[in-house]
């Protein structure tokens, strides 16, 4: 669980590692454009959480997703989730992000809440 807290705190402060024209303050930014789900099963086959299987999926959009996307490059080659021209995908470990001209930036991450280990937070 300690690992989970460290990873979430790091993601909330991703702006500290991004090149930003504004002065870095070391303060967390609000994460207003994010959603989460506690579930059981796998990202592509989710069900209600159980006493033995509880996972957390987090989806982040907007500027925070762009900062994460920019931090985990380069683009994945020959990987696509849609037929949209201009789609870009990036991933590191269990964190993956996409950019679609029609929808902007979106990043996914997740954790197994029973073990604290990273887990994919989304699927195509």
Regions found by a protein language model. Give the residues of each.
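Positively charged n-region of N-terminal signal peptides that target proteins for export
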Residues: 1-5
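Hydrophobic h-region of N-terminal signal peptides that target proteins for export
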Residues: 9-17
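Cleaved targeting-peptide boundary
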Residues: 17-26
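Mature extracytoplasmic domains of secretory-pathway proteins
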Residues: 30-93
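Short, exposed beta-strand-loop hairpins at the edges of beta-sheets
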Residues: 98-124
